[in-house]
């Protein structure tokens, strides 16, 4: 596998990626894309392929240089640069022992509190330590602005509207509050929406940020998390506003949203104005079926099912990737990747096989 990836290199081309996302041209090769790679995966790749060997470990910029080097080696045109860290909002979290075997184990894995978040009352809302854009540490983004190669781009995730409302209230509490205290829910949507609008504007002020990527899980296997009416009235208008900011600043608006979103897909495409949809699961809607339904209206990203990658051997993975590409590369608007993220529980070899088969496709 090491030999194949090294002998079949691909070079980033962010301009072609942008044309793919806008469905302006049929790609000349397969472009990989991911919401993000877990830290453990990136570290494993860097050690396996000797990407750290000539770096100065005492250099404070080592981590940023490695972000570029790892993603460039893997063939990505854009990659996530986390600016808003997971602890920027004060949330109730449930750490549990990570069950990943071997060197990719991270010790603990944090799960969202489903029942009661830090905000339950108007008093909690008033006393909550609301973060501001002014409090962000932008040094990593400023460094990328000066040092990121011109054929690459970066992004951070934005527009976690429903997700953050859910985290702050707790999903169970949200379901009650929609009926018992809608004004509190609306106040949360307003506060969170304004924060992410400001953050989207900030991201657009950096030339190195090539795309605006909203990330907001809105569904589960059989339905949306809350009613489509609630989503249309309280959540999607904020995504529309973020998409408008992105488009006004010459960026495509991508959305990562897990779950069965069939009831709001037309809204996402026609009213929000998304350029690309990410996150697909075989048990909900395989990406090949999604491509047949939606590819004339929106670009589709990823879709190699994470559960499948975790459980399958090389021949099956190669076959699945090739079958997916035969459908999704027939026209415009597709990039190869996992159905969700490159999580640390995906076997590294399986992930690399997926990438390698993508490199082989047009050869």
Predicted feature locations:
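Short, glycine/charge-rich beta-strand/loop segments that flank catalytic centers
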Residues: 81-93, 160-162
């Amino acid at each position: 596998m090491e030999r194949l990836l090294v002998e079949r290199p691909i070079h980033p081309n962010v301009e072609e990626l942008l044309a793919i996302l806008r469905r302006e041209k049929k790609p000349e090769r397969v472009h990989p894309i991911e919401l993000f790679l877990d830290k453990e995966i990136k570290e494993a790749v860097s050690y396996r392929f000797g990407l750290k060997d000539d770096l100065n470990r005492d250099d404070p910029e080592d981590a940023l240089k490695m972000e570029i080097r790892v993603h460039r080696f893997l063939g990505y045109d854009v990659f996530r640069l986390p600016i808003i860290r997971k602890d920027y909002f004060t949330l109730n979290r449930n750490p549990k022992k990570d069950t990943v075997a071997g060197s990719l184990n991270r010790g603990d894995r944090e799960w969202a509190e489903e029942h009661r978040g830090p905000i339950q009352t108007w008093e909690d809302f008033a006393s909550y330590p609301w973060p501001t854009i002014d409090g962000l540490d932008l040094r990593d983004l400023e460094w990328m602005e000066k040092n990121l190669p011109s054929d690459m781009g970066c992004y951070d995730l934005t527009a976690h509207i429903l997700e953050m409302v859910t985290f702050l209230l707790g999903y169970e509490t949200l379901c009650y509050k929609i009926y018992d205290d809608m004004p509190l829910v609306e106040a949360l949507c307003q506060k969170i929406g304004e924060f992410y609008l400001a953050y989207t504007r900030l991201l657009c002020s950096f030339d190195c940020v090539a795309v605006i990527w909203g990330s907001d899980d809105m569904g589960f296997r059989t339905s949306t998390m809350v009613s489509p009416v609630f989503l249309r009235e309280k959540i999607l208008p904020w995504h529309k506003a973020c998409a408008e900011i992105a488009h006004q600043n010459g960026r495509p608006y991508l959305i990562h949203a897990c779950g069965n979103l069939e009831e709001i897909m037309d809204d996402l495409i026609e009213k929000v104005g998304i350029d690309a949809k990410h996150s697909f699961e075989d048990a909900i809607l395989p990406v090949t079926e999604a491509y047949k339904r939606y590819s004339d209206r929106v670009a589709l990203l990823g879709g190699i099912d994470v559960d499948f990658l975790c459980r399958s051997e090389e021949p099956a993975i190669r076959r699945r990737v090739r079958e997916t590409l035969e459908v999704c590369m027939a026209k415009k608007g597709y990039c190869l990747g996992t159905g969700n993220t490159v999580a640390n529980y995906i076997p590294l070899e399986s992930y690399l096989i997926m990438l390698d088969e993508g490199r082989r496709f047009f050869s």
